[in-house]
Amino acid sequence: MKVYVIDYHKDDPKKCTGRKLVKLKLAELTRVGRGIILNPFSERTLSINDKDILIKSGITIIDTSWNNTSQNEFKNVRGEHRRLPILFAGNPIHYGIAYKLSSLEALMATLYILDEVKEAIKFSNVVKWGHTFIELNKELLEAYRNKDEEEIKKIEKEIIEKILRK
């Protein structure tokens, strides 16, 4: 499985998990999208149906800052754009905030949902808080794991409705 990172150099280099993956040779820096493109603005939700894409072509993470990001940074990147369902950040910068995942967290979530749990856990060792993300989202990740897009959207809708009722 290949992991690619497109780096827009908008993050603090010391906190940038995409760059860390490249530095550790766990990902390859690229300017071209390949395989699954993790895109928080995509209409399509990642699901087990995307596993063949992961195996054949890999996954591309677009590393940018949540403070300065827009759809424009994603729309010109070729590949199969997918968004992740609701998950909560475990990183120290956005801890507990829905959808505001680091590049590493997005990668771990993708692997977990696509039933590559051992790989997700392997990547969680890259940073001190990696296991925090997995533990914080364990119930959600297990609910999404190995499910098709419709099932994941249904689960996500139920979770959001439950949160809004509180």
UniProtKB/Swiss-Prot annotation:
Domain of life, per lineage: Archaea
Chief site of localization: cytoplasm
Catalysed conversion reaction: an N(1)-methylpseudouridine in rRNA + S-adenosyl-L-methionine = N(1)-methyl-N(3)-[(3S)-3-amino-3-carboxypropyl]pseudouridine in rRNA + S-methyl-5'-thioadenosine + H(+)
UniProt key word Cell wall biogenesis/degradation: no
Entry EC no(s): 2.5.1.157
Keyword Cytoplasm among record annotations: yes
Binding site for S-adenosyl-L-methionine: 17, 62, 84, 99, 103
Enzyme class per UniProt: transferase
MF terms in GO: 18S rRNA aminocarboxypropyltransferase activity; S-adenosyl-L-methionine binding
Record key words, sorted: Cytoplasm, Ribosome biogenesis, rRNA processing, S-adenosyl-L-methionine, Transferase
CC terms in the record's Gene Ontology section: cytoplasm
Localization of this protein: Cytoplasm
GO terms under biological process: enzyme-directed rRNA pseudouridine synthesis
Protein family according to the UniProt entry: Belongs to the TDD superfamily. TSR3 family.
Function description: Aminocarboxypropyltransferase that catalyzes the aminocarboxypropyl transfer on pseudouridine corresponding to position 914 in M.jannaschii 16S rRNA. It constitutes the last step in biosynthesis of the hypermodified N1-methyl-N3-(3-amino-3-carboxypropyl) pseudouridine (m1acp3-Psi).
Name assigned to this protein: 16S rRNA aminocarboxypropyltransferase
